[in-house]
Amino acid sequence: MNPNQRIITIGSVSLTIAAMCFFMQIAILIITVTLHFKQYECNSPPKNNQVTLCEPTIIERNTTEIVYMTNTTIEKEVCPKLAEYRNWSKPQCKITGFAPFSKDNSIRLSAGGDIWVTREPYVSCDPNKCYQFALGQGTTLNNRHSNDTIHDRTPYRTLLMNELGVPFHLGTKQVCIAWSSSSCHDGKAWLHVCVTGHDENATASIIYDGRLVDSIGSWSKKILRTQESECVCINETCTVVMTDGSASGRADTKVLFIEEGKIVHISPLSGSAQHVEECSCYPRYPDVRCVCRDNWKGSNRPIVDINVKDYSIVSSYVCSGLVGDTPRKNDRSSSSNCLNPNNEEGGHGVKGWAFDDGNDVWIGRTISETLRSGYETFKVIEGWSKPNSKLQTNRQVIVDRGNRSGYSGIFSVEGKSCINRCFYVELIRGRKQETEVWWTSNSIVVFCGTSGTYGTGSWPDGADINLMPI
């Protein structure tokens, strides 16, 4: 082959390859544009209430050069899953005890940073993530406004919300105005019940998906208040326990049934419980169960069972003779008959929790019988079904006796096959006990149920009060 023929042959081959690449690029462009418009069809809302099925699509992007072509990227596009109401129909997880989960160290961090002054913390989760809540005092700790923040109810208190484990810094969202609150996620959006106003005529604002939807005023004109922990939603209906009236005598407790922020029914408390405040509630499909605080007659904790379908309420008391409130008698002397308050150190009290496990009961309480100091958990065999049962097992120390604790409450987390129970402990610091400073605030520690093994420890607040701003 002479030189001219070689040149012609090489040119022809190059021209053929270039033409092939050109047509392939046109084909790729057409496919890309087509898939782009299909993606928008997938993400757009269905018309005329029709259901649009979204399937994964594969997009191939090719990089072409004159001599060779390489495949570089394969991506999957999946349409977002439609949100559904939660029904909590899975069984409760079988556990052997509790394992450490989270600690925010808010007070220690306040020694050198701008952290909110808070109390009444709690934890609640949406289907994907857990959040911590607390009632802020309208000030950071290193601020003169923190003076005298021992008071529970002021117009400056707001409900704070952060991802669990993130202390309440200056960028924290203030969800609503509140000196008493409860929050829960129904699977589609957050519901917040926020109480504020005058003691004798407060208002509970019902906020759903970031909007004020409903409200209810004080019905007994004496400090309307709610759970200070998560509410519970079964399918579309969320239940919130609220009390108005005396903190040391007969009060008027009601259960609100709320759908997408609208109060659809109100049921009065019924059953044998004499005084109910600050309930810690959990889903027990198809119903809701709460363990509360009797601030009048009993150191045994009242139970409130809520039927979500027919709005009926039944109340009683935890059977365990190892009782959960503070103050209380020592374990040898304490008692409970499942039905009535035990009339043992009934005045005052502290928010706490317990939950049933078949006939048994898991309980969390302060270690001290008289003070909000230390914290322990344990299971009482037949403590849910047998009057005055006292066989204790699986005891764990969460905070040692020499360190302060406070309120505690329950929250539930749905796993792949079961619903786990978790709890938080409020670690109060400052006034009244610690008079070196003028403020009162808290941090939290969080544990969750485990079916595995676990060790021992103590997880107090840990701040040196002498290093803190006054």
PLM feature spans:
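Extracellular cysteine-rich, disulfide-stabilized repeat modules
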Residues: E77, C290-C292
